[in-house]
């Protein structure tokens, strides 16, 4: 199916089609044997090949003026400039394999993956990226984190577990690299933030859910008293692992100044900031600030009300944000180019984000299941608009931050790119396993609605700090406002106090006389109103994904298409539609 779960530095929202494909698509086949000492060995390996092509032309508002576009910045268009409609953007061979050992009440699991994208490794592109010096030819992934590279090997899960019978209770313990999934959310992120996302893995054709979630070094327990409706689970993570994002210059990247230090393209401040010698202002790359490894933990309690067939949950956790925040060091433009070395940008990961929540899961008449989740963070990091930061960082006095950083501010002053805000989210979802219909033997339908509220001012309020909105829209009505930049002369697109939207997914299963299962599916996402502080909701953004999958025994093949609403003005990825194919074998 398609590929994409709502979130990441402004592109995480396009991960959902991939995760749905991974979740509903993989045959459950495995090799099993038993050793002489009674140890059971279970292994599963999936070998696949997939390819993707660009389906739409690039939009001029997402390309810098130097290349014929009308964007407010030239720091976001490398992915667009490297690929035209119909171009091959990925051609990847993959192997994902896991082995589990079980004996009695103990066990261990190890999972790894390997991939080779021949298109990214060998195909010439016309523009390049900052890593290869913007030279036409092959892209370079030098300096990318391992998981974002064009080929590589990565260890995923690696943990040991034990199941223990205590005095009138059962205890399960797992220690090692593992994935946890808390809460009731299917598409949106709320309580399910214990495991970060590997975005490049999500985008690769034929992605499996095992590739999508990054295992974290964790000690986990689940305690279930006998004859009691209450259970308790908890975790402690001793290693910080951030999101993996698209490498600069690749098709899905919407920022040329990528999180990896190797993506060191200077951030153009725009023609409004000009030095005394007439040169244009730029920000150089600084060193990222990584979160500490310690201090991530959580506790949850569940109550199973059998009389009403409902489970309730209470959650509390303290995590470091895996989503990078853009921050800066100042340098007043009146000092001239000699002080440019002090003007820098960097990415950092805010620590100790507290989150609390309550959930409900129940079954309704007619075969429907219902899930609800209410989550709240009193100190969620919200990205301050980067363009407002640019103008303040050079002491221009422009924009809502200008007064806080006058031209007398010492060069090299740290400018934190986020504020801590209150953030609450309510989501409701439903799932139904479909009965035979339209010639199908059955199917699945899922719907989810989310409403988010944040403790921020309306962006149109005088003096309000503005959050979100990408580089492409340049300045704004409080600073410089060239009429050539669509969406610039407006307070739209900045994060709003409230936002809401929904997601739909449906799949039907057909059996044939030749033993081939055919599974057509459709995914639709619609962000109805507002822009959320975490980027999950972006007004007018719509995503449509359709696919058809064929399975016969251990073999499978799939064709898919994912498109976006090209009129969603403040969606930086609205022109990145694609279609793809993938084939695989599981043993």
Which functions belong to the PLM regions below?
Residues 31-43, 55-58, 99-108, 121, ...:
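Short loop/turn motifs that connect adjacent beta-strands in outer-membrane beta-barrel proteins
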Residues 42, 94-98, 157-159, 218-220, ...:
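Membrane-embedded beta-strand positions in outer-membrane beta-barrel channels/transporters
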Residues 574-587:
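Outer-membrane beta-barrel "beta-signal"
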Residues 88-92, 304, 311, 316-324, ...:
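Detector for outer-membrane/organellar transmembrane beta-barrel domains
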Residues 59-80, 121-144, 198-204, 248-285, ...:
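Solvent-exposed loop segments that connect transmembrane elements
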Residues 49-55, 105, 114-118, 177-181, ...:
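Transmembrane beta-strands of outer-membrane beta-barrel pores
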Residues 102-258, 319, 501, 529, ...:
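Outer membrane beta-barrel
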């Amino acid at each position: 199916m398609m590929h994409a779960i709502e979130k990441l530095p402004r592109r995480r929202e396009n991960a959902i089609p991939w995760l749905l494909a991974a979740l509903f698509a993989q045959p459950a086949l495995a090799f099993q044997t038993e050793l002489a000492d009674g140890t059971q060995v279970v292994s599963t390996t999936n070998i696949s090949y997939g390819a993707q092509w660009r389906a739409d032309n690039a939009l001029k508002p997402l390309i810098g003026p130097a290349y014929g576009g009308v964007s407010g910045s030239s720091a976001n268009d490398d992915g667009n400039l490297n690929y035209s409609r119909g171009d091959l953007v990925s051609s990847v061979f993959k192997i994902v394999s896991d082995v589990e050992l079980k004996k009695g009440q103990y066990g261990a699991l190890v999972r790894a993956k390997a991939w080779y994208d021949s298109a990214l490794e060998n195909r010439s592109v016309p523009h390049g990226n900052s890593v290869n010096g913007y030279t036409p030819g092959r892209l370079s992934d030098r300096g990318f984190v391992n998981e974002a590279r064009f080929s590589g090997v990565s260890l995923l899960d690696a943990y040991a577990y034990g199941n223990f019978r205590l005095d009138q209770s059962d205890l399960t313990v797992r220690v090692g690299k593992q994935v946890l999934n808390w809460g009731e959310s299917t598409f949106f992120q709320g309580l399910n933030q214990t495991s970060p996302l590997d975005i490049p893995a999500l985008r690769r054709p034929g992605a499996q859910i095992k590739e999508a979630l990054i295992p974290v070094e964790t000690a986990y327990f689940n305690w279930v008293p006998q004859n009691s409706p209450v259970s308790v689970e908890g975790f402690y993570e001793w290693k910080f692992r951030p999101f993996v994002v698209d490498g600069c210059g690749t098709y899905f990247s919407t920022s040329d100044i990528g999180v990896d230090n190797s993506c060191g393209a200077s951030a153009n401040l725009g023609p409004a900031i000009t030095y005394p010698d007439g040169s244009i202002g730029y920000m150089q790359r600084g060193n990222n600030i990584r979160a500490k490894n310690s201090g991530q933990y959580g506790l949850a309690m569940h109550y199973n009300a059998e009389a009403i067939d409902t489970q309730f949950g209470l959650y509390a956790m303290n995590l470091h944000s895996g989503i990078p925040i853009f921050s800066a060091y100042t340098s007043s433009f009146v000092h001239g180019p000699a002080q440019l070395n002090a003007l820098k940008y960097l990415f950092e990961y805010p620590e100790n984000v507290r989150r609390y929540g309550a959930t409900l899961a129940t079954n309704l008449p007619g075969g429907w299941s219902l899930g609800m989740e209410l989550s709240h963070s009193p100190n969620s990091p919200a990205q301050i608009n980067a363009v407002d930061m640019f103008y303040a960082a050079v002491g221009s006095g422009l924009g809502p931050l200008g007064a806080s950083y006058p031209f007398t501010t010492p060069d090299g002053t740290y400018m934190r790119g986020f504020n801590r805000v209150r953030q609450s989210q309510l989501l409701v979802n439903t799932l139904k396993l479909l009965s035979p219909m339209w010639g199908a033997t059955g199917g699945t339908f899922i719907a989810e609605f989310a409403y988010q509220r944040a403790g921020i001012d309306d962006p149109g309020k005088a003096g309000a700090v503005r959050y979100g909105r990408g580089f492409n829209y340049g300045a704004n009505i409080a600073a410089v406002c060239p009429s050539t930049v669509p969406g610039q002369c407006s307070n739209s697109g900045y994060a709003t106090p409230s936002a809401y939207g929904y997601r739909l997914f449906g799949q039907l299963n057909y059996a044939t006389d030749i033993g081939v299962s055919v599974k057509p599916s459709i995914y639709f996402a619609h962000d109805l109103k507002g822009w959320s502080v975490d980027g999950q909701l972006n007004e007018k953004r719509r995503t449509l994904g359709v696919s058809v999958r064929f399975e016969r025994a251990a073999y499978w093949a799939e064709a898919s298409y994912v498109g976006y609403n090209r009129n969603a003005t403040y969606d930086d990825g609205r022109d990145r539609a694609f279609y793809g194919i993938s084939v695989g074998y599981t043993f």
